[in-house]
Amino acid sequence: MDVKGKTAPVTGGASGLGEATSRRLHAAGANVMIADFNRQNGEALCKQLGARAAFAEVDVTKTETVKAGVDLAVKTFGAVHILVNCAGSGWVGKTVDKQGPHDLDTFKKIIELNLIGTFDCLRWAAFHMQNNQPNEDGERGVIINTASVAAFEPQMGQVAYAASKAAVVGMTLAVTRDLARSGIRCCTIAPGTFDTPLTALMPQPMKDGIIQHIPFPKRFGKADEFARLVQHIVENAFFNGETIRLDAAVRFPPK
């Protein structure tokens, strides 16, 4: 699918990997709907991008804001062709420690944000995508979700995060098969450790400890490297039903 002229909501689109994706798709000619709960950052980015950019205040744990955001993209730009799910968060907490078992409400919140939020966004986007006119390959839409290498090699303390991201990986092929008749593709990217505002807060010794486990290149990923893969998935119609690791071959140990 050609990015130019297509409409792409990006959840978590005002910071980190989502911001890089918003910028790259916009530069490639897409209409970008920055869907984020941070209004200040979202509107500031929208202003920077200028024409073909809009902002929707979306909390992916609240389905009414998800539906409103997708509806706004359709109202503003006429259709939805691409969805990139970047909204999500992590949490550090072991299954049990000396103080007691993992807090169940926290576990549920991470699942609600990373898994249910992802599914809620894609179901509303797909509902609109199925009405698009197909291109020469019969494509009507492309959905790209974000998982994590923690879905495959979670470290200690990542039980909630790993469960949520592994579930995103697990539903990728199921969603793909559900949407195939509608001409909608679905892929997932599982990134390793990337330079984002969150990792910028890490102390340098912690960063060095992570980098020592990365075979090559021995650095954190750049947000635009994630965004470039997003663009390639959109443009390559044979990418479908796959989870792609973007991690410089890292395989993290338990801790």
Where are these regions (language model features)?
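Canonical Rossmann dinucleotide-binding motif of NAD(H)/NADP(H)-dependent dehydrogenases/reductases
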Residues: 2-33
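Short C-terminal tail/terminal secondary-structure segment
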Residues: 153, 231, 235-255
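Conserved mid-core segment of classical short-chain dehydrogenase/reductases
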Residues: 67, 75, 90-108, 127, ...
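A conserved structural motif in NAD(P)-dependent oxidoreductases
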Residues: 215-226
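Alpha-helical segment proximal to the catalytic Tyr-Lys
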Residues: 127, 176-178
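Residue(s) in the substrate-gating loop at a strand-loop-helix junction
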Residues: 148
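Active-site helix of classical SDR
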Residues: 122, 164, 172
